[in-house]
């Protein structure tokens, strides 16, 4: 069981899962919250709500694809309060699979995660005390198997899922916990644009509650809801001829 998660940094905190997580940590004893997002008004609103719950909260509009800016931001706040949890949550959907959108998806969903996780890991390695040192990465159920409705999105999430799983094992000896989150369809600005069916759709606060409990228990892979997790896992182990047949009958647009 993880204890003393007092200083928390969350990217993509101005909506969806990130916003809901910020509120949960503010309501459950976090002393310092450092939040980033792309929308000033929404970010200011969530900062104010977290402060009402008693957490000292600072927000910053920052582009996670900016490596130098992310390093500076993370180091700056670690000096103010030794970080216990760094949550690489920011991500985008692809929309139409144009070259521009494809590159943007990988830059944000993959490089954005690396730009968040890498400086945090280096800071954690230098810390020799017993305080909590946690990395959390938001991947997706779509990362279990490439979905025809979103090739770039699925591939980007598969990349960070595999990265997180490997990182968890490689950092175990350093007493650094790594949790990989693979949610299904959760209310966010991304799913608000979806026109395809979204089975087992979940509100952000419910999803955040599952994630919070999973991190507290240090569960390596927090994937939900379980019917979707089982379904995509099953598809991933089927022979290609069968999985191709099934996918040919699924929606080709998200």
PLM regions: where:
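Conserved glycine-rich Rossmann-like NAD(P)H-binding loop of the short-chain dehydrogenase/reductase
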Residues: 30-46
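Conserved glycine-rich cofactor-binding loop
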Residues: 14-15
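Active-site loop immediately N-terminal to the catalytic Tyr-X3-Lys motif
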Residues: 145-152
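C-terminal helical subdomain
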Residues: 180, 196-233
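Short alpha-helical oligomerization interface
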Residues: 96-107
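Residue(s) in the substrate-gating loop at a strand-loop-helix junction
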Residues: 140
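Active-site helix of classical SDR
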Residues: 117, 156
């Amino acid at each position: 069981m993880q204890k003393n998660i007092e200083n928390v940094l969350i990217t993509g905190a101005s909506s969806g899962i990130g916003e809901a997580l910020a509120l949960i940590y503010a309501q459950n004893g976090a002393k310092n919250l450092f939040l980033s997002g792309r929308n000033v008004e929404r970010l200011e609103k969530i900062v104010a709500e977290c402060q009402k719950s008693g957490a000292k909260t600072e927000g910053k509009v920052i582009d996670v694809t900016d490596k130098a800016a992310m390093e500076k931001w993370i180091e700056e706040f670690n000096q103010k309060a030794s970080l216990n949890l760094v949550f690489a949550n920011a991500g985008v959907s692809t929309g139409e699979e144009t070259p521009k959108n494809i590159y943007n998806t990988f830059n944000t969903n993959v490089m954005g995660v690396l730009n968040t996780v890498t400086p945090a890991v280096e800071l954690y390695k230098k810390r020799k005390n017993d305080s909590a040192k946690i990395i959390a990465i938001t991947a997706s159920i779509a990362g279990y198997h490439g979905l025809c409705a979103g090739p770039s999105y699925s591939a980007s999430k598969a990349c960070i899922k595999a990265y997180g799983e490997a990182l968890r094992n490689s950092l175990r000896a350093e007493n650094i916990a790594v949790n990989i989150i693979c949610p299904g369809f959760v209310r966010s600005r991304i799913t608000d644009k979806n026109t395809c069916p979204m089975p087992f759709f979940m509100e952000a606060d419910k999803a955040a509650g599952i994630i919070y409990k999973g991190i507290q228990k240090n569960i390596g892979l927090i994937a939900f809801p379980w019917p979707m997790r089982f379904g995509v896992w099953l598809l991933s182990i089927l022979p290609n001829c069968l999985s191709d047949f099934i996918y040919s009958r699924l929606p080709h647009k998200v």
